[in-house]
Amino acid sequence: MSDLLIHRHGRVLQLTLNRPQARNALNKALLTQIAEALEVAATDDSVGVCVISGNPRFFAAGADLNEMAEKDLPATLDDIRPRLWTRIDAFTKPLIASVNGYALGAGCELALLCDLIVAGDNARFGLPEITLGIMPGAGGTQRLIRSVGKALASRMVLSGESIDARQAQQAGLVSDIHPAALTDEYALKLAATIARHSPLALRAAKQSLRLSQEVSLQAGLQQERQLFSLLSATEDRREGIDAFLQKRTPEFKGR
């Protein structure tokens, strides 16, 4: 059976990590499958949103330590995994993590890379790499501090301690918490709601939101206005306004 299960739910694509014997550890093969699936979804106009999920006990417990144990310095410098993470990060449509159980190390970094995290009440997030004599290497230090702030990010990275779903929500890492048995259901429901909107507007909004973490406020405002102006020339913008005035549901075409 594949390490990545792929299911369609209307305009929502669900990618389910499927290495239960390895606690969904993210090895190169699984990262490659995720990157390839997202690249296909990016060019498929019938896909509006992607959801990445795990199993009831583990979203993903980290990188595959069996692979890492074989890496010396030259092999680490030539590792393909940074390129795989870059490919995953390049996905331009909304990406939601549906997290039950443990999201640790690379698993936490995968969740951080998503636009939204929907968590089960049994979820735990952590970056325990420091306990192995290493540090996060797939965006953990950079994305976590932008999500939860310096104090909590520093505590998690330097101590290796994890936080539960409620702490993650209070810190701004998690958007929603649900009973673990219903996490995927609610994540897919949220994804379906988002997928109803204009694909062009969703991509532009995601681009602007992500840019806000990298540039000054003034530069971000300028980019936001440029994207807003470009959307004003689209058929979807006219359809959205017409539908609102006519009190009907819009039918967006991505044009």
Regions found by a protein language model. Name each.
Residues 1-55, 86, 233:
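Conserved CoA-thioester-binding segment of acyl-CoA-metabolizing enzymes
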Residues 29, 33, 80, 87, ...:
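Charged catalytic carboxylate motif
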